[in-house]
Structures are given as structure tokens and as C-alpha cells.
Regions:
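Conserved AMP-binding/adenylate-forming core of the ANL superfamily
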Residues: 59-60, 77-132, 149-154, 214-223, ...
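Gly/Ser/Thr-rich phosphate-binding loop
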Residues: 216, 310, 338-342, 352-418, ...
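Conserved ATP/PPi-binding loop(s) of AMP-dependent carboxylate-activating enzymes
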Residues: 426-430, 441-476, 515-517, 612-613
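AMP-binding/adenylate-forming catalytic core of the ANL superfamily
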Residues: 144-169, 184, 333, 340, ...
Length: 640
């Protein structure tokens, strides 16, 4: 644990006094082809733009600058795939060569500055190279999670209108191969917009059939470019305010929401975060156990670690089952990981399989300093279990696809603040976080309200949605004028610690009482036999809504589930009180989740309420929804 007094309050106050000076200073850590004319232009864009007049290139800052500075032989990426049985180390020098060559391939396929490229790929190094190659030539990448349903991919093709799609023959899941190419072919058949070309990486597990005239073999095309000395030697200078990428928010229905990330602000904020928030030094190994299809993968598998000159882990595997619940410990020990960033759901899975942490004893985690959790609410029992097992600080932090980096966290690099379980700690410099009521008035400490951020948002946050400025205003800015709406609800305590309790749509109204499902989940998760849980409001004729708790029991628990259900009901009554009207707990084998580990609460609610529902495109295993339906039926709920 860090014994130094934290510099956080001093640094945050400095940002408050002079936001432009603060970010102007941070911008000095980036290599610019032309320095920005100003730090911020409040008149540009929807709420202002960062670093106007600046000319830069994201790929240059992620790769070239490190090779130029003598870091070429350091590992940039370590690809570790228990699913493919492959490990590969890619140095900064090698990454530069591959990115230069793929940049030339993209140009030969007609991709120019400002053109869009969709990347529909598994967790392989070529996916990272693809993103960097787009950045190198000034193209805009849009990564779509590999294996995403064809219809969802088609809507993204129609929205982004890519010149080229980069894909692979397949992705790997435990015990099965996911064929990507048929999904891609179907998506292109469904979409109005047709890409000019597709570049397909043939993986050894499956060979995809190629469409003549449209599809190109990745390896052959790359090798041809290499042997003919085709490479984009220099990075294309782009404006700091030009888009780097579009990332569609998961689970959107109908017209997808394309979050735009710009080049300049993104580099400045992410580079700042590596040292100041995550406390990692250049040359150290950093591992974000996520997927490149999600924002965590974009920001902290690829861009931030590479901007900072770190070694980043690209892991194609799971927390459990590849081969066991010791998988994460093996990766940390083998590659000397200093900091791990993952979702709480991964640790709940490990805790369920190996509650006593027996597998941990097999590995030497001497270099491991910090565990960071984000992506969903981190329940205190999971945090406490991780602290007890790992004996390192376990830090919850909170952010969104839209922001690209932490809104709130515990800044390791500035000296840690005391941890309060259930809180992602405090607002990061750049974010003026307020808790407000429906009329945008700030509420008192410890009182629930909507969490908002006073405009302008800091560098790296979305300037807008792709070709949808009006939708940006409607979605995020209109409800609370002068603020960005996070759509999360929570409170701040007397020390300014932020507690994110639930999405605003997860606040349930029980007979006029506004109750947080997050608070109830915290209580259920404290039961010694509960591995994980979800609480949601279901329709009730008398009270409007009543809470219903779904609980997954730990491995090895052999008591009757009905007994544990009764204990859970009693526990909520004891800790929250009868006002919660919590009378329904249902033990289930597992909870339905998105591939990024978020529980599909909305879908469970629709099933429980007997409403019509559609299969979420992001679901990990559709069979689980049938199991939920059966469990509800057993309690006389859901569609009859």
C-alpha cells in the first residue's frame, strides 16, 4: 500500500483553477507535428473542442516515437492465447514494420484520409495492427466485436459506410469455433452500403471461402506488399480534432450510436492517465483483460499502454476454463504484469470456481502491484475477496464508452486515497461531477440523484456521435442543461467520494419509494453462499414495481436453494428494511451477460414481466435466457 500522502487534492485544485493550463501542460507529453493554436475552443463543436490547430498522428505516438527513442527492441505486445495454444511477442520495431506494410495494403485497396474501415476481428495481433495502420494513414477505424450478429454488423456498415472491412475466418471460444466469414457475408448482403473490399485473415482453425473480386487473403496481400517494399513510411498528419475512431455502443437497438473519438485529446488524456491514475511506468507490463471490441480494449489494451511505452498483453482466453481459475495468475506471473484491469464479473467467476484461492499458490506474482476493476458496479464482497487473495490494492474506477477514460478513480500515480468499498473514489481532473435532482439542482451529501458532469467534458471524451449532432444533444445534453448526463444514479458522501449505485433506469419505484437495485445487490452478494446476483424491478399491480433477486450459488454449495433464497430475503429485510418489499429471490445456475460481462438486466426484466423481448445481439450464451424463463415459471412469473 502506498504510504505517501496523496497529491490528488492539490492536482485536482490546480485543474479547477486553470483547466486550459493543466491540459496544455499534459499536451507537452505528446509529439505534435504542429502544436495546437489553443488548448480549448469553447465556440467550436457542440460544447467546444480540444487542441484546435494541433496537427498530430496517433500511430506515430503509439509506435514510431518509441522506436526513434531507442525502445524498438522492447516488447510492445505479448499475444497469449490459451484458446489457440499460441504465444507471440511483438517488439515496437516489429509493430512499426507491420503497421507500415498494412498501411500500404489499405492504401492499395483505396482507403484514404477520412475514409472508414470496419475491423471485425478476434483478439489477435493483426487486429491491433489494423487499428494502428488506419491511424497511420488518417483513416477512421470502427471495431465491431468479432462474432457480433450479422444484422448488428449490417447496421454498423450502413452507419459508418466503410471502404474496406478487415476480418478473420473465425474467433475462438472455449469448446467452439465461431465462424466469422458467414456472418460478414450475411451482413454485407443485408446492408445498403457495400464495402469495396474485404481483407480476411485465415486462421489455422478454419479456412474461409473468399468472394472473388471483393475478398483478399490477408497473409498473401501482406507478403506481396512486403516483398515489393510497399510501406507507408511516414505517418499522415491529421488535425487533433479529426476523428480517430467510431465505436458503437453495445446493446443499442435500431440506429446504432457511434461514439466518436478524436486524435489529439484522446492521446493527451490517455497518456496522462497511465502514470497518474494507473501508476505505471514506461517499460512495465500492463494488462487490460478485455476485448478490442469494447472501449476498455481500445483505450487500455492498445492506445494508452502504447502511448506510454509499456508492454501490453493481448489475451485470447477466459478467467476460468482456459484451462482453470488460475489462468489470470499464470499470465501475471509469466509476463511480469505490474497492473491488471478487468471487469468485476471476471473475479466473481474466479471466486466461484476457486473460493479459497488455492490455485494462486502455484504462481509468483512478485511484480504485480495493483488490480483495477471497471465496466460494471464492483460489489464489496468481490473487492474484499480480491484484496484478501492478492494482497494488493484493489481499485474500482468508473467510466463509460462515451468518456474513453476514467471519470472517477483512485489515482495510484498521485498517491492513493483511502479506499471505501462500493465507491470508485473521486472525480479525476477534467471532470466536475455533480449529483442533481430532476430540476438540475445539486442535492445534499449522501442523497441519491442523477450523476452529471459539468461541461465542457475533458479531452478524450466524445465530441459528438458519428454524423448525429442532434442525437448527441438529445441523448446526453438536453435533459440537464450545461451538463453531460451519465445516465447513472448515485450520491457523493461528505468526503466527496462518488457512489455509483445503478443506471438511472435501474432505480426502482416501490410504492413511491425510490430504491437502488445496486444497494440490494450489495446485500445479497454478502451472503456467504452467493457467487453473484442481479436485482431488478418487476411489475406489481399493487406497488408498481417490486424487487426480484436472481442469485447464483458458489461451486460446492450443497444446501437446498430454497433455504438460501429465504435467507437472502431475510438479509435484505434486515439490512435495508421492509420498505424494500423484497420477497422474491430465485436461485439460478447462471446469469445472462453480454460478451463484455455486463448482466442483461433489461432482458431479464422483460421475461419476468411477460413482455415481448428480442435476443440481445451482445449476449454471450442465449441458452441462459431459457433457464431464466424456466426459473421464473417455477415461481409463477413470466409469460404463462
Amino acid at each position: 500500500m502506498d504510504a505517501r500522502p496523496s497529491r490528488y487534492h492539490e492536482v485536482y485544485a490546480r485543474w479547477q483553477r486553470d483547466p486550459q493550463g493543466f491540459w496544455g501542460e499534459a499536451a507537452a507529453d505528446i509529439d505534435w507535428f504542429e502544436k495546437p493554436k489553443a488548448t480549448f475552443d469553447p465556440k467550436a463543436g457542440i460544447y467546444g473542442r480540444w487542441f484546435p490547430g494541433g496537427v498530430c498522428n496517433t500511430c506515430f505516438n503509439a509506435v514510431d516515437r518509441h522506436v526513434n527513442a531507442g525502445r524498438g527492441e522492447q516488447a510492445a505486445l505479448i499475444y497469449d492465447s490459451p484458446l489457440a495454444g499460441v504465444k507471440r511477442t511483438i517488439t515496437y520495431h516489429r509493430l512499426l514494420t507491420e503497421t507500415q506494410v498494412l498501411g500500404a495494403v489499405l492504401r492499395d485497396l483505396g482507403v484514404g484520409e477520412g475514409d472508414r474501415v470496419i475491423i471485425y476481428m478476434p483478439m489477435v495481433p493483426e487486429a491491433v495492427i489494423a487499428m494502428l495502420a488506419c491511424a497511420r494513414i488518417g483513416a477512421i477505424h470502427s471495431v465491431v466485436f468479432g462474432g457480433f450478429a450479422a444484422r448488428e454488423l449490417a447496421t454498423r456498415i450502413d452507419d459508418a459506410k466503410p471502404k474496406v472491412v478487415l476480418s478473420a475466418s473465425c474467433g475462438l471460444e472455449p469448446g467452439r469455433i465461431v465462424h466469422y466469414k458467414p456472418l460478414l457475408d450475411e451482413a454485407i448482403a443485408l446492408s445498403q452500403h457495400k464495402p469495396d473490399a474485404c481483407l480476411i485473415l485465415q486462421r489455422p482453425q478454419v479456412e474461409a471461402s473468399l468472394v472473388a473480386g471483393r475478398d483478399h487473403d490477408w497473409a498473401k496481400t501482406r507478403d506481396h506488399a512486403l516483398t515489393h517494399a510497399r510501406s507507408v513510411y511516414d505517418c499522415v498528419p491529421v488535425a487533433a480534432t479529426d476523428p480517430l475512431y467510431i465505436l458503437y455502443t453495445s446493446g443499442t437497438t435500431g440506429q446504432p450510436k457511434g461514439v466518436v473519438r478524436d486524435n489529439g485529446g484522446h492521446m493527451v488524456a490517455l497518456k496522462w492517465s497511465m502514470k497518474n491514475l494507473y501508476g505505471v511506468e514506461p517499460g512495465e507490463t500492463y494488462w487490460a483483460a478485455s476485448d478490442i471490441g469494447w472501449v476498455v480494449g481500445h483505450s487500455y489494451i492498445i492506445y494508452a499502454p502504447l502511448f506510454h511505452g509499456c508492454t501490453s498483453i493481448l489475451y485470447e482466453g477466459k478467467p476460468v476454463g482456459t484451462p482453470d481459475a488460475g489462468a489470470f495468475w499464470r499470465v501475471i506471473a509469466e509476463h511480469g504484469v505490474a497492473a491488471l484491469f478487468t471487469a468485476p464479473t471476471a473475479f466473481r467467476a474466479i471466486k466461484k470456481e476457486d473460493p479459497d484461492g488455492k490455485l494462486l499458490a502455484q504462481y509468483d506474482l512478485a511484480k504485480f502491484r495493483t488490480l483495477f476493476l471497471a465496466g460494471e458496479r464492483a460489489d464489496p464482497p468481490t473487492l474484499e475477496w480480491a484484496e484478501k487473495m492478492l494482497k494488493v490494492p484493489v481499485i474500482d474506477h468508473w467510466w463509460q464508452t462515451e468518456t474513453g477514460w476514467a471519470i472517477a478513480g483512485n489515482p495510484v500515480g498521485l498517491g492513493m486515497l483511502p479506499i471505501k468499498h462500493g465507491s470508485p473514489t473521486v472525480a479525476m481532473p477534467g471532470y466536475d461531477v455533480r449529483i442533481v435532482d430532476e430540476a438540475s439542482h445539486e442535492v445534499a451529501a449522501n442523497k441519491m440523484g442523477s450523476i452529471v458532469v459539468k461541461l465542457p467534458l475533458p479531452p478524450a471524451c466524445l465530441p459528438t456521435l458519428w454524423q448525429a449532432d442532434e442525437r448527441m444533444r438529445e441523448s446526453y445534453l438536453d435533459e440537464f442543461p450545461g451538463y453531460y448526463k451519465t445516465a447513472d444514479a448515485g450520491f457523493k458522501d461528505e468526503d466527496g467520494y462518488i457512489f455509483v449505485m445503478s443506471r438511472t433506469d435501474d432505480i426502482i419505484n416501490v410504492a413511491g419509494h425510490r430504491l437502488s437495485t445496486g444497494g440490494m445487490e450489495e446485500v445479497l452478494a454478502s451472503h456467504p453462499d452467493v457467487a453473484e446476483c442481479a436485482v431488478l424491478g418487476i411489475k406489481d399491480e399493487l406497488k408498481g414495481e417490486v424487487p426480484c433477486g436472481f442469485i447464483v450459488l458458489k461451486s460446492g454449495v450443497n444446501r437446498p436453494p430454497t433455504e438460501i433464497e429465504k435467507e437472502c430475503i431475510a438479509l435484505i429485510r434486515e439490512k435495508i428494511g421492509p420498505v424494500a418489499a423484497f420477497k422474491l429471490a430465485i436461485a439460478v445456475a447462471r446469469l445472462p451477460k453480454t460478451r463484455s460481462g455486463k448482466i442483461l438486466r433489461g432482458t431479464i426484466k422483460k421475461i419476468a414481466d411477460g413482455d415481448r423481448w428480442t435476443m440481445p445481439a451482445t449476449i454471450d450464451d442465449p441458452v441462459i435466457l431459457d433457464e431464466i424463463g424456466s426459473a421464473l415459471k417455477g415461481k409463477g412469473l413470466g409469460a404463462s
